[in-house]
Regions:
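N-terminal membrane-anchoring alpha-helices
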Residues: 1-48
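Short beta-strand-to-loop junctions in surface cap/lid or active-site-entrance loops
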Residues: 49-65, 115-121
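Short beta-strand element of the alpha/beta-hydrolase
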Residues: 65-73
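Short alpha-helix in the alpha/beta-hydrolase fold that links the catalytic acid
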Residues: 84, 180-190
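Conserved alpha/beta-hydrolase
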Residues: 85-105
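Gly/Ala-rich beta-loop-alpha elbow adjacent to hydrolase catalytic centers
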Residues: 128-137
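A conserved short beta-strand
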Residues: 147-158, 168
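Short beta-strand/loop motif that positions the catalytic acidic residue
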Residues: 165, 171-173
């Protein structure tokens, strides 16, 4: 009986260690930004990048009246979205890229909290996100839709019913996207 308990305990410890190693490998294996692309866009950007906190990068033009809070896709480096943020800021739109724990927006869906309060001069706010980030942006809007004009989804969909809100929704997906679950995308269009 004693041997059996030891064997079970040993197996449980091995299983726990294996699981922890697999989790560590999973969260450290993510899509990184192309450094050459980052360098190329930095040479031409006109709006200065600001680091607001440990988890938020901002591109805020001087007279911006519109702001976008952007949640990155699952396991995608936040820096990969900096060229997009810089381009939008050149159109006089403030963009806030929120870095997520372990590159997973599901771990901090409320990361947008407090950003709007820091910029009272911005009158129109939008949430945006790519892939998992878009789904979590929609989740955030389920509770905070009164303070936003709309939602922008890039290769994403809302699993939360926002149809009874006044939000404008823009959904963009590439026809050759082989990562997006097209069945889920179609099934959730109603939301």
């Amino acid at each position: 009986m004693k041997l059996n308990k030891r064997s079970i305990l040993f197996a449980a410890v091995i299983l726990l260690i294996t699981t922890l190693i697999q989790c560590g490998v999973y969260v450290t294996d993510y899509y990184r930004a192309d450094r050459d692309a980052i360098v190329a866009f930095q040479q031409h950007q006109t709006v200065t990048k600001q680091v607001l906190s440990d988890n938020t990068i901002a591109y805020v033009p001087h007279d911006a009246k519109q702001g976008i809070i952007f949640y990155p896709g699952g396991k995608v480096d936040t820096a990969a979205y900096e060229p997009l943020a810089s381009s939008l800021s050149e159109q006089n739109i403030a963009v806030f890229l929120v870095e997520m724990p372990f590159h997973l927006a599901v771990l901090d869906a409320d990361a947008a909290d407090g950003i709007q309060d820091q910029y009272p001069e911005i009158s129109s706010w939008y949430m945006a996100g790519h892939s998992l980030g878009g789904t979590m942006a929609a989740y955030y809007l389920e509770e905070h839709h009164e303070s936003f004009e709309g939602l922008i989804l890039l290769a994403s969909y809302s699993t939360y019913d926002l149809s009874q809100t006044q939000l404008n929704v823009l959904s963009i997906a590439g026809s050759e996207d082989q990562v997006l679950s097209w069945d889920q995308y179609e099934n959730n269009k109603i939301n």
